[in-house]
From Swiss-Prot:
It is found in: Cytoplasm. Pathway: Purine metabolism; IMP biosynthesis via de novo pathway; 5-amino-1-(5-phospho-D-ribosyl)imidazole from N(2)-formyl-N(1)-(5-phospho-D-ribosyl)glycinamide: step 1/2. PANTHER family: PHOSPHORIBOSYLFORMYLGLYCINAMIDINE SYNTHASE SUBUNIT PURQ. It catalyses: N(2)-formyl-N(1)-(5-phospho-beta-D-ribosyl)glycinamide + L-glutamine + ATP + H2O = 2-formamido-N(1)-(5-O-phospho-beta-D-ribosyl)acetamidine + L-glutamate + ADP + phosphate + H(+); L-glutamine + H2O = L-glutamate + NH4(+). The active site is at 85 (nucleophile), 193, 195. CDD domains: GATase1_FGAR_AT. PROSITE patterns: GATASE_TYPE_1. Pfam families: GATase_5. This is Phosphoribosylformylglycinamidine synthase subunit PurQ. Part of the FGAM synthase complex composed of 1 PurL, 1 PurQ and 2 PurS subunits. GO terms for molecular function: ATP binding; glutaminase activity; phosphoribosylformylglycinamidine synthase activity.
Length: 223
């Protein structure tokens, strides 16, 4: 398995994403936003940061980058796509995930570890966690308030697309939502950073199982 780690101007978590992929036992390669092909890749990791300086709004300019059409193609083919923080914002901008990310209710940038609950462990991203398991991931965002209409929220609940919730909601997200998947279950977006939760020495290794779950799910289908 080989992951593409996208790099935009202003990305600052691409190295963490790369290391997370390698730690899970697969290959990874950085891919510049100006590229027009993701041939040879089995999945996509869209890192956090401030793509294009977050001008217009977070993820807006990245959403029209040349590489995005290939991200959509891989998603349509059922390949795993994970967007974290700014990556989640980009996935909502390009329509691969519903909803939007708004300014935190506090209007402050929040940077700290947060306790989260796995509320759906039947996905390609969470199948190594226990249902209801509590995990610790770092958060680092100013626009992490997940918002959606009541209609979309009901669809998310009906389709079991909400996978991760905050225990102590730090940003005002609708129903404490921290992470979701698309209906097919192969595209995932979350504001917390599992790629920064790989070492107990640094405070938490709760993120290890998320990347291992992605690899496990892919191998079950292809090996």
């Amino acid at each position: 398995m080989k992951f593409a780690v996208l790099v935009f101007p202003g990305s600052n978590c691409d190295r963490d994403m790369f290391n997370a992929a390698i730690k899970s036992g697969v290959e990874a390669e950085y891919v510049d936003y100006r590229e027009t092909s993701l041939s040879g890749f089995d999945g996509v990791l869209i890192p956090g940061g401030f793509s294009f300086g977050d001008y217009l709004r977070s993820g807006a300019m990245a959403s029209v980058a040349p590489i995005i059409s290939e991200v959509k193609r891989l998603a349509a083919e059922g390949k795993p796509v994970l967007g974290v923080c700014n990556g989640f914002q980009i996935l909502t901008e390009i329509g691969l995930l519903p909803g939007a990310l708004l300014h935190n209710d506090s209007h402050l940038f929040i940077s700290r570890n947060e306790e989260l609950e796995i509320v759906n462990n039947q996905t390609a991203f969470t199948n190594l966690y226990e249902q209801g398991e509590k995990v610790i991931y770092p958060v680092a965002h100013g626009e992490g308030h997940y918002y959606c209409t009541d209609e979309i929220y009901q669809q998310l609940k009906a389709n079991n697309q909400i996978i991760l919730k905050y225990v102590n909601n730090p940003n005002g997200s609708y129903d404490d939502i921290a992470g979701i998947v698309n209906e097919k279950g192969n595209v995932c977006g979350m504001m917390p950073h599992p790629e920064r939760a790989l070492e107990t020495l640094l405070g938490t290794d709760s993120g290890v199982k998320l990347f291992e779950a992605m690899v496990k799910s892919w191998r079950e289908q292809h090996v």
